[in-house]
């Protein structure tokens, strides 16, 4: 078989990945692109100059790996989130990776995997089940309310009955935009019998509710 005729179906993929469709967010030529969470305003000249200067400085060390723990970045992120949420956070509370999808994958590699389950409340962010499949974590789901907000009674019942190892709650929800109150997150946490709750706050700057980091000291 010549290389130019090889298709994805010819490759030795895992059986559970065959027939799956890749994730993709449409790249639309419109001023506001909330589907990809992009800032509609271009960076200022001062910011561009600052980034260029920082890249030039870092380029002198391109022959070395960067800090694998990203301590400087995590320090700055902790300061930003402390100011944004009012909850004191330190480097130990933060992890950094190449986008939130990589973080989600790392979480499921650590806390999901074969023989474990993850649950989400749909419709919600489509990457949650895709990453679950990719990490061989069995995907479970429960429905949201008619307005696509989180039906907390349904969520608590699903968590209690199905005992998932990982629970996904998106706040604000993607794509419908509703935020989840802290009291509802407490109910989910209290219903869990082990495992971890992942509150996906990718659109946190648009939230109408406090960040879930406010619950760290209690749980």
UniProtKB/Swiss-Prot annotation:
Pathway: Amino-acid biosynthesis; L-histidine biosynthesis; L-histidine from 5-phospho-alpha-D-ribose 1-diphosphate: step 7/9
Single annotated GO MF: pyridoxal phosphate binding
Nucleus is among the record's keywords: no
InterPro entries: Aminotransferase_I/II_large, PyrdxlP-dep_Trfase, PyrdxlP-dep_Trfase_major, PyrdxlP-dep_Trfase_small
Protein keywords: Amino-acid biosynthesis, Aminotransferase, Histidine biosynthesis, Pyridoxal phosphate, Transferase
Disulfide links within the chain: none
Enzyme class: transferase
Substrates-to-products reaction catalysed: L-histidinol phosphate + 2-oxoglutarate = 3-(imidazol-4-yl)-2-oxopropyl phosphate + L-glutamate
Cofactor: pyridoxal 5'-phosphate
Quaternary structure (record): Homodimer.
Protein known as: Histidinol-phosphate aminotransferase
Organism, scientific name: Mycolicibacterium smegmatis
